[in-house]
Amino acid sequence: MADRNDPLLRTPAWRALETHLAEVRPLHLRELFARDPGRGDRLAAEGAGLYLDYSKQRVTEETVRLLVALAEARGLPGRRAAMFRGEKVNATEGRAALHVALRAPRGERIEVDGKDVVPEVHAVLDRMAAFAEQVRSGAWTGFTGRRIRTVVNVGIGGSDLGPAMAYRALRAYTTREIAFRFVSNVDGTDLAEAVRDLDPAETLFLVASKTFTTLETMTNAASARAWLLAALGDERAVARHFVAISTNEAEVRRFGIDPANMFGFWDWVGGRYSMDSAIGLSTMIAVGPGGFRELLAGFRAMDEHFRDAPLERNLPALVGLIGVWNASLLGAETVAVLPYDQYLDRFPAYLQQLTMESNGKRVTASGAPVEGHGTGAIYWGEPGTNGQHSFYQLLHQGTHLVACDFIGFCRTLNPLGRHHDLLMANLFAQGEALAFGKTAEEARAEGTPEALVPHRTFPGNRPSSTILADRLGPGTLGALVALYEHAVFTQGVIWDVDSFDQWGVELGKVLANRIVKELEAPADPALAHDGSTNALIRRYRARRGGSASS
């Protein structure tokens, strides 16, 4: 048997899948369901309050058996155990990836470098809860003594996408006494529009940056600070209107924030895995400490399911392995995430970072090039039914094979006439249409003119999974996020990539730091970029003007 360091394509388990692919590829989902009417019940799994129907994927029970064999050959059980134990599974940075510790219950022992980290996690959670209650109750006031009416989270990447997504997803559970806004883009428009109609005396900024040096975040924070002081006129006001989510006490002090209002997290928490750490302070203020505990409980339930359930009935393992099958073997290199719940409108954007920053890698963990197969798929999507009137045309009749993840809930949070039945009817209909399509004969039988038959024919055989839960809530959201976290990890093990680093974001940062000096230079700088970049810089400098109307 090949060990984990062998190139993927040489493993017997992979070769068995390639042989199996040749047998399965010609089969249409129509044929698979005709042969096996009970397929819809058997190719499904349940855990942590989520139900996964993967019967409309282009797999058979033999496919799943072979994928599980591949996972075992690639060492998934051992790598999973290593992650839960706090071993340094982030090889290139020499760190643990211990987001599961963020939702571990009190009393559980999880060690990093010989130190139990669970007490520290709960110490931070307790401080967050006390602060959140102060803000929610009005006990925490601004510099002038007025209560806080708006919380603005300032961050980027994992310090923004998770909290922003969670706020929108849990809007039905949030306090309506306080408004929440999120600023991430270094484009000044983002901050300007976020604060345009706010009262500085009633605004609290949460500045989320582990190092407190992140370019975009600290640029926005400095401008927010200037906006506040322009109105309140006293440096002491900063300490009542700014809170830090950081580990750099010196920089936090220098900014004017009281270190007592600094909430930390750890190197073993990656940004895209941090929404249930102190990065989630805005979420806790919005839904309350009780709601945040429910969120953590949902994460924990899926953690335990991933850790304990057999791989063939393990939701994250199945989602991850089928994703490998689709992207690396079947040729479906893009995944449309289609939540049929408006509250999840930012969930696809959140998954873009989680999946693509984690597994968008061209070398293995040991630095060898990935050859002969793809790695991370491209994730995107929109809530239903909006997407049906946008890009579903391509899903049904385009030349690209797109795998789809439908997400829906049996009960709505906003009962309104027949809205929810119509919504869910569309979800089920789209999965059915993608799988089975419409033949030319069926189109003709409907009376379609012959010239239009090719246009009214749907090939079908487009793979999709459907995830159902009873109702969207904090616990359900936690389980859903953890499902994809662990699916990403599963794929990383199969592809042998480091799912916890992100070196691909560094080069652009370095070049931007160089270019901004050239843009801000008072005299025309000597440029040494390529011809295109030089020309763009010169044109920008010549035409930027000095006002919004230039």
Curated annotation (Swiss-Prot):
Gene Ontology CC: cytosol
Gene3D superfamilies xref list: 1.10.1390.10, Glucose-6-phosphate isomerase like protein, domain 1
SUPFAM superfamilies assigned: SIS domain
InterPro entries hit by this protein: G6P_Isomerase, G6P_Isomerase_C, Phosphoglucose_isomerase_CS, SIS_dom_sf, SIS_PGI_1, SIS_PGI_2
Disulphide bridges, residue numbers: none
GO molecular function: carbohydrate derivative binding; glucose-6-phosphate isomerase activity; monosaccharide binding
Alphabetical GO biological process terms: gluconeogenesis; glucose 6-phosphate metabolic process; glycolytic process
Enzyme class: isomerase
Main location: cytoplasm
Active site: E357 (proton donor), H389, K509
Protein origin, superkingdom: Bacteria
UniProt-annotated location(s): Cytoplasm
Catalytic activity, reaction form: alpha-D-glucose 6-phosphate = beta-D-fructose 6-phosphate
EC number: 5.3.1.9
Pathway: Carbohydrate biosynthesis; gluconeogenesis; Carbohydrate degradation; glycolysis; D-glyceraldehyde 3-phosphate and glycerone phosphate from D-glucose: step 2/4
Keyword terms of this UniProt record: Cytoplasm, Gluconeogenesis, Glycolysis, Isomerase
Purpose of the protein: Catalyzes the reversible isomerization of glucose-6-phosphate to fructose-6-phosphate.
Family note: Belongs to the GPI family.
PANTHER family named in the record: GLUCOSE-6-PHOSPHATE ISOMERASE
UniProt name for this protein: Glucose-6-phosphate isomerase
